[in-house]
UniProtKB/Swiss-Prot annotation:
Taxon lineage: Bacteria, Pseudomonadati, Pseudomonadota, Gammaproteobacteria, Thiotrichales
GO molecular function annotation: unfolded protein binding
Gene: secB1
Keyword set includes Protein transport: yes
Pfam families: SecB
Name used for this protein in its record: Protein-export protein SecB 1
NCBIfam families referenced in this protein's UniProt entry, alphabetically: PRK05751.1-4 (NF004393), PRK13031.1 (NF009590), secB (TIGR00809)
Length: 149
């Protein structure tokens, strides 16, 4: 098998596409007992770029922490990467864009959120690992189920 036929995956660039942090109740939140309730949301988008076999994957991680019935803080990061994915079947490329790439980006997104939280004066936030393979398989199943109905 020649070199060109081998599956290829390469990280071209990893970057923060968008970042935000807010403390909507800063006048009240500092005087309450700290018993945080964490809410997270993840989204993955992948876009084909003009360069051959090149894609941008964007992982959006939203975090909202409530304390004593009010929002303590909200943080959002859109962690992006440009990846070259070549010599793979379409199903493998889709998996790379929507499961493998987000897995790489999640480390950076978690770090960005943690840094924002600490800079905001709150205790460090350690987010749990995410199984992007399982999320991708679930999305495939949901897509197949919706096509059957």
């Amino acid at each position: 098998m020649d070199q060109q036929a081998q599956p290829q995956f390469q990280i071209q660039k990893v970057y923060v596409k968008d970042l935000s942090f807010s403390i909507p109740n800063s006048d009240k939140i500092w005087t309450t007992n700290w018993k945080p309730e964490l809410h997270t949301d993840l989204k993955v988008e992948a876009t084909k770029l003009p360069e051959e076999n090149t894609y941008e994957t964007v992982l959006t991680l939203e975090v909202k922490v409530e304390n004593d019935g009010m929002v303590a803080f909200e943080a959002e990061v859109k962690q992006a990467g440009i990846f070259t994915v070549a010599n793979m079947q379409e199903a493998q490329i889709e998996h790379a864009k929507k499961a493998f790439c987000p897995n790489i980006l999640y480390h950076y997104a978690r770090e960005a959120i943690s840094d924002l939280v600490i800079s905001g004066g709150f205790p460090q936030l350690c987010l749990s690992a995410v199984n992007f393979d399982a999320m991708y398989q679930d999305s495939l199943k949901e897509s197949a189920d919706s096509k059957q109905h």
